[in-house]
Amino acid sequence: MDGAYGHVHNGSPMAVDGEESGAGTGTGAGADGLYPTSTDTAAHAVSLPRSVGDFAAVVRAVSAEAADALRSGAGPPAEAWPRVYRMFCDMFGRYAASPMPVFHSADPLRRAVGLYLVDLGAAPVETHAELSGRMLFCAYWCCLGHAFACSRPQMYERACARFFETRLGIGETPPADAERYWAALLNMAGAEPELFPRHAAAAAYLRARGRKLPLQLPSAHRTAKTVAVTGQSINF
């Protein structure tokens, strides 16, 4: 990245560390608070993952161009969104297809944001408000790549809250007693894991006979080999 951060980088304003070049003042961002993604700080830009660096620079450049159009009274540039969309789809396709050797807590949310952007399609955007929002979501997707280290979270807090209401593919919220359930399960696994299939078979048997309440768990210091059920027994 260039050393002169106060100059234009790839057509996008880059502020000196600690400053947002005109953010919220009308000199860098568009009027009415639109296009906050038209500027960035050098420190934040270099902290992004290298895999999204080029795309983030394009988002800044397109946002700055659109902000200029807004200030001059023109509509959004016709090719602005199609250009960003094509680049994002290519990048997101590689991201979605790549193996994840280490799970990151932001990955499910990042996939949800990515799928939302892909579903928008490549048609040109007609209003500045819509284009500004899409640029913000693109920047948010990039920043999820350095979640917990991002220095600009306040930019996303309201606009991106919608993504926390979506289904992220990580299951339902666990019940309040989930910790007690898993603690018992882990204790069983540590004692005799080979009994798991038999416990599951017993549970299925009991469920089929209409039993709703769980059996009493054996004490931590005793392993039960037989569970009595209405005069019968299930041997483990």
Curated annotation (Swiss-Prot):
Pfam families with a match to the protein in the record: Gene66
A GO cellular component annotation in the UniProt record: viral tegument
Compositionally skewed regions (Gly residues) per UniProt: 21-31
Description of post-translational modifications: Phosphorylated.
Record's keyword terms, sorted: Host nucleus, Late protein, Metal-binding, Virion, Virion tegument, Zinc, Zinc-finger
Triggers of expression: Expressed late in the infection cycle.
Location of the region described as Disordered in the Swiss-Prot/TrEMBL record: 1-32
Chief localisation class: virion
Places the protein is found: Virion tegument; Host nucleus matrix
InterPro entries for the chain: EHV_Unk
Designated name of the protein: Virion protein US10 homolog
Source organism of the structure: Equine herpesvirus 1 (strain Kentucky A)
Lineage: Viruses, Duplodnaviria, Heunggongvirae, Peploviricota, Herviviricetes
Gene giving rise to this polypeptide: IR5
